[in-house]
Design a protein with these regions (language model features):
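Extended, alpha-helix-rich binding/interface surfaces that flank or overlap catalytic cores
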Residues: 75
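Solvent-exposed interhelical
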Residues: 70
Length: 158
């Protein structure tokens, strides 16, 4: 999936144009690329290991995954993929890839809120409702600790 929605468009679009960019931002892109890949692959591994499934619709996790990166944010795999695209836009100084990255943010948000979250709500019911109440969709709540720690402090297991 990463190849279809991340690598192929980035490689193709990166050759269309370039824009002026301070060198420091190109280096930021060099950090975002591997960081995004690491987050994406780690998130996928947690789906396999702790969810006993994958990110593919044909083999979804059998258990709600609330460990690893999912302690801090509900969609770390998507965040990792988007970081790869933004990193590539900065590295290649590509306006087309930057526009693609912004478009993918919008598409991903709409997909998650309109399609994925209702399915997760039906599949995991109360566990998912508790998880949603303690863990943000896109931005981690660093100052308050993890979803698990907050739930344990309140006496509510996830």
């Amino acid at each position: 999936m990463i190849g279809i929605f991340v690598v192929l468009p980035v490689v193709g679009l990166s050759r269309l144009d370039t824009f002026a960019l301070p060198e420091v931002l190109r280096y930021a892109g060099l950090v975002l690329l591997p960081a995004g890949a690491a987050l994406s692959y780690t998130s996928f591994w947690f789906f396999i290991r702790h969810g006993r499934g994958t990110a593919f619709p044909t083999d979804p996790p059998r258990e709600l995954v609330v460990r690893g990166p999912y302690l801090y944010v509900r969609n770390p795999m998507y965040i990792g993929n988007l970081a790869i695209i933004f990193g590539a836009a900065l590295c290649f100084r590509s306006a087309a890839v930057l526009v693609y990255a912004v478009a993918m943010c919008v598409v991903t948000h709409l997909y998650v809120t309109l399609s994925e979250e209702p399915v997760l709500d039906r599949r995991y019911r109360d566990s998912y409702a508790r998880y949603v109440s303690t863990t943000r969709r896109w931005l981690p709540r660093w100052s308050h600790g993890s979803a698990i720690a907050r739930a344990e402090r309140s006496g509510r297991p996830i």
